[in-house]
């Protein structure tokens, strides 16, 4: 009998496969075993994002009060109502906290040391140098920055901040993870890049979550904002590696299309981090350039106005809500109306990247409606993905419009009344390339939305309003003692 071939054991599998002691194919964002059994996979909703999506506590500890409150967490699904600080001692939590996964070693944390040669592992070092080189020279220029100044920030200032260290390994690992994803998109069969993208993502998420749990401070606010942005980018870019089920027949019971809720969780997480750290980062030259590069958020609050391209998405809403829980009627109406308003704004905007604002600005109620597979919410989501067609030449958005729109369409029954509302996104999705004729797009693009009385202002004003609503009832951060600092588990 020939000897068994040796193999290198991977620790990058999902938690469910590890618990079941079966081999994980490590396909992101949902491994083959989880997809086969129709169960959630922590690749599609990583631990830290899942934990950070838990609603924060509604009460805070009064200064000097004898009874401390539980440590709040960032809510990646909805706005938290407590500051991102950590009390000195937590009270009894509702559930036991999960230990942080052991992050992979890197030259930015604790490098791999050979017991015989006492040197850094050459292969790991060369891979990290390759990833950082690719990020600074290529990937940083694909982040849809809208301005040369913002591009320079991501290309030069962000890596410099990562190099400065100060214990902020999560920013360096987030950079390496994004670079690995980019290289992996060009070499999908390179297993080293697959493992690297998984490992650096897990490491970044673990350290990022620990830092958020300890609290946002003037010292870490910039790095946390930049890392949250790169995590959101990872959540979006990882979607290109999902098995394509967009060509399934409508109503096909075997279809496994799942709407990418991770996009919403991650981008709304960026908004939450920004709002909770705004008192510090709005003075940052780095953050100011990034925020100012975003299109002016002039939102018409009347989605049923005569020039509303997507106003038809609200037809029949009153009749639909007659069977809704009375406690949810107002929030559901507002969720749909606001989502349509954002679509109208992005549809006319000269800057194609304006469409990505949708994932960060829609309400938690709308995300819940998508999760519940409400037809109206899914039709609106199909229009959002159709808007991304203008960026089909960007590597992490390539073919996303077609795949996601057709995937969403597959969730509708053949005789659904919603088919006429899906005609426009389907027409856009099946086009070749990112150049779309104006008669098909449906409107003329505007450099800036026209001034109107009933609009929201600049992106900075929008953030300041959100931050004020978030923090008007909060207290000053509680100082953190050395013994309160979270230390990640040591590697096996």
UniProtKB/Swiss-Prot annotation:
The modification Phosphothreonine is found at residues 82, 217. GO terms for cellular component: nucleus. Phosphorylation at Thr-82, Ser-92, Ser-102, thr-117 and ser-305 by HOG1 is required for regulating expression of ergosterol biosynthesis genes. Residues 58-119 are annotated as: Disordered. Changing residue 305 to A: Impairs phosphorylation by HOG1, blocks induction of CYP51A expression and exhibits hypersensitivity to tebuconazole. Disruption phenotype: Reduces the production of ergosterol. Leads to increased sensitivity to azole compounds, but not to iprodione and fludioxonil that target the high osmolarity glycerol (HOG) pathway. Changing residue 217 to A: Impairs phosphorylation by HOG1, blocks induction of CYP51A expression and exhibits hypersensitivity to tebuconazole. It is found in: Nucleus. Changing residue 92 to D: Mimics phosphorylation by HOG1. GO terms for molecular function: DNA-binding transcription factor activity, RNA polymerase II-specific; zinc ion binding. It holds the Pfam family Zn_clus. Residues 78-95 have a biased composition (Low complexity). The modification Phosphoserine is found at residues 92, 102, 305. Transcription factor that targets gene promoters containing 2 conserved CGAA repeat sequences. Positively regulates the expression of ergosterol biosynthesis genes including CYP51A and CYP51B encoding the sterol 14-alpha demethylase, and ERG6A and ERG6B encoding the sterol 24-C-methyltransferase. Interacts with HOG1. This is Zn(2)-C6 fungal-type transcription factor. The lineage of its organism: Eukaryota, Fungi, Dikarya, Ascomycota, Pezizomycotina. The gene is SR.
């Amino acid at each position: 009998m020939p000897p068994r071939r040796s193999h290198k054991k991977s620790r990058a599998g999902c938690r469910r496969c590890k618990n079941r002691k079966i081999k994980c194919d490590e396909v992101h964002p949902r491994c083959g075993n989880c997809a086969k059994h129709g169960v959630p996979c922590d690749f599609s909703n990583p631990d830290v994002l899942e934990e950070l999506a838990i609603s924060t506590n509604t009460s805070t500890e009064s200064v000097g009060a004898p009874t401390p409150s539980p440590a709040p967490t960032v809510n990646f699904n909805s706005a938290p109502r407590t500051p991102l600080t950590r009390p000195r001692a937590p009270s009894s939590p509702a559930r036991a906290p999960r230990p942080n996964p052991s992050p992979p070693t890197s030259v930015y944390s604790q490098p791999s040391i050979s017991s015989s040669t006492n040197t850094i592992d050459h292969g790991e070092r060369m891979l990290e140098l390759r990833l950082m080189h690719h990020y600074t020279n290529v990937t940083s220029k694909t982040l849809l920055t809208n301005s040369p100044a913002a591009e320079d920030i991501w290309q030069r200032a962000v890596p410099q901040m990562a190099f400065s260290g100060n214990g902020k390994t999560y920013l360096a690992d987030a950079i390496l993870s994004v670079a690995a994803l980019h290289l992996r998109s060009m070499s999908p069969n390179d297993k080293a890049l697959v493992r690297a993208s998984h490992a650096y993502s897990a490491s970044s998420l673990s350290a990022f979550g620990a830092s958020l749990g300890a609290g946002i401070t003037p010292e870490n606010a910039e790095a946390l904002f930049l890392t949250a942005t790169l995590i959101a980018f990872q959540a979006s870019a990882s979607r290109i590696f999902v098995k394509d089920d967009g060509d399934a027949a409508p109503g096909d019971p075997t279809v496994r299309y799942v709407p990418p809720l991770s996009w919403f969780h991650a981008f709304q997480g960026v908004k939450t981090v920004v709002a909770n750290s705004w008192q510090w980062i709005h003075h940052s030259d780095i953050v100011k350039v990034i925020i100012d590069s975003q299109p002016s958020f002039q939102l018409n609050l009347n989605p049923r106005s005569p020039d509303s391209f997507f106003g038809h998405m609200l037809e029949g809403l009153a009749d639909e809500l007659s069977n809704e829980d009375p406690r949810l009627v107002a929030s559901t109406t507002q969720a749909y109306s606001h989502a349509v308003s954002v679509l109208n704004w992005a549809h006319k905007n000269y800057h194609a990247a304006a469409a990505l604002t949708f994932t960060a600005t829609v309400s938690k109620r709308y995300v819940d409606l998508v999760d519940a597979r409400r037809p109206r919410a899914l039709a609106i989501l199909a229009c959002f993905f159709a808007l991304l067609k203008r960026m089909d030449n960007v590597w992490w958005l390539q073919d996303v419009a077609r795949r996601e729109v057709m995937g969403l369409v597959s969730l509708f029954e053949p005789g659904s009344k919603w088919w006429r509302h899906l005609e426009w996104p389907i027409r856009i999705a099946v086009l070749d390339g990112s150049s779309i004729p104006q008669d098909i797009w449906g409107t003329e693009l505007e450099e800036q939305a026209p001034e109107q009385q009933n609009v929201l202002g600049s992106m900075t004003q929008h953030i300041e309003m959100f931050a004020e609503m978030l923090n008007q009832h909060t207290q000053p951060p509680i100082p953190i003692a050395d013994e309160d600092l979270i230390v990640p588990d040591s590697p096996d």
